Amino acid sequence: MDVKAQVEVEKAVQILKLLGDKTRLSMMKLLQNNECCVCELVEIYKASQPAISQHLRKLRDIELVKERRKGHWIFYSLNKENSYYQFV
């Protein structure tokens, strides 16, 4: 396997591991058709703000989720341009 293919495999493994978490996977499905702020996700999942932010950071770091800032608010949505969007 060449280096580029190996890098792609490693990236796919990383993404699939992150999506193996039930909360993150359900967030991805929710964000597929909706843009949400952290406070909305806290209410939906009945979880702490730091916990929700941690999930979103992991999804943002691999570019499956994108953010849009409006004043003090940050809105999250699915990054449908990511080549791994199909896994969702």
Model-derived features: positions:
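Beta-hairpin "wing" of winged helix-turn-helix
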Residues: 40, 60-70, 77-78
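Short capping segments at the starts of secondary-structure elements
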Residues: 22, 33-37
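Conserved segment of winged-helix/HTH DNA-binding domains
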Residues: 11-12, 16, 75-88
